[in-house]
């Protein structure tokens, strides 16, 4: 018996472009259906384009709203909505203009944050202080902290520079809160129960079961041999063992002084690849390098758009094509531009569709061949980006990418968002690939070289 789904009268009217019927669909929660219909009419009808624009903004789909804004300008949406869309795609000057038309606290605060992003702390401070006059109570502390930060950047308040150790301390805070090594070591008698708890904590921190068992057994034997009775002394021994284990997993980023040094980034979608590329581009630009980004992940429009936003933020150039383009062709164009126009560093983004293993491996190998057509010694680095929050799963993912290309270094991201900070130990031990960089926060300067000693100190504090 076959059942046919009958469309309601509302749906039939909506499909003919009836605005009230489309609004009724949205009211009924059928937003996807409404969106599909609105897309069909948006290029011809301004009233439906405005409705689609508002729907996108409500759903947080700001990037998708941008083409409508580009076509209709200030004929659609409210100033604050338009500002948020411009901000999302990196059209910062237009975003500022729209926010200033509103002039409320939120808008002025957003203007201040945009100027800060554009590295204009003086303008950021001007608008933050204007926002201060309108600040609601619940935002007062946040704004005060932001103003203090701006004053430090402008040299109006002396600031103590945050060291790598301080950044790692901050980044590993969630792991320390979840695992509490300090509580175990402080004032505890060293007995069998102590070692059982230590092993559990190491497993919880995600150093890997095998590593946790081996480390605990080694410390147990050492405690018997040296007649150690205090937890603090075991802590020092554990630090020594972890530093020894990690010493071969520390490596500097290799960027030769020449035109067209390539850093190829691989990793699963969502690992933080694009953000890592953006932050590194910013840091290299600050050092005076001429940097080019290549949007080689052509399977996701969002990846291309995100990299474009980072290029604007870092003040560097980008080579990109539309979604669905051949990644090899994009990389070819990027390499050609780099050689012809003298770009010193080329940062290449790639797709990370792990569920399609064979096509992914073939695609990465093809990209590498394209790079080597221009320079047989490149890429200088092939960096695997791993999300610390995925813990042990990251190791399984890494093995797939190792099949495709020679990985020369690892970037561990989102250490600040994970209670699995010990995964760095497991990654080092299992993969035996140097960890070149770690992401310890959302700030543009929170991508840091990996320092094994500082990492161990921060983890066990």
From Swiss-Prot:
Q: Which residues does the annotation say bind GTP?
A: 267-274, 349-353, 413-416
Keyword annotations for this protein, in alphabetical order, are: Cell inner membrane, Cell membrane, Cytoplasm, GTP-binding, Hydrolase, Membrane, Nucleotide-binding, Receptor, TPR repeat
Database matches in InterPro entries:
AAA+_ATPase, P-loop_NTPase, Signal_recog_particl_SRP54_hlx, SR_rcpt_FtsY, SRP/SRP_N, SRP54_GTPase_dom, SRP54_N_sf, TPR-like_helical_dom_sf
Query: Quaternary form?
Result: Part of the signal recognition particle protein translocation system, which is composed of SRP and FtsY.
Q: Tell me, what does this protein do in biology?
A: Involved in targeting and insertion of nascent membrane proteins into the cytoplasmic membrane. Acts as a receptor for the complex formed by the signal recognition particle (SRP) and the ribosome-nascent chain (RNC).
* NCBIfam families the record matches: ftsY
Q: What is this protein called?
A: Signal recognition particle receptor FtsY
Species annotation: Aquifex aeolicus (strain VF5)
Query: What taxonomic classification does the UniProt entry list for its organism?
Result: Bacteria, Pseudomonadati, Aquificota, Aquificia, Aquificales
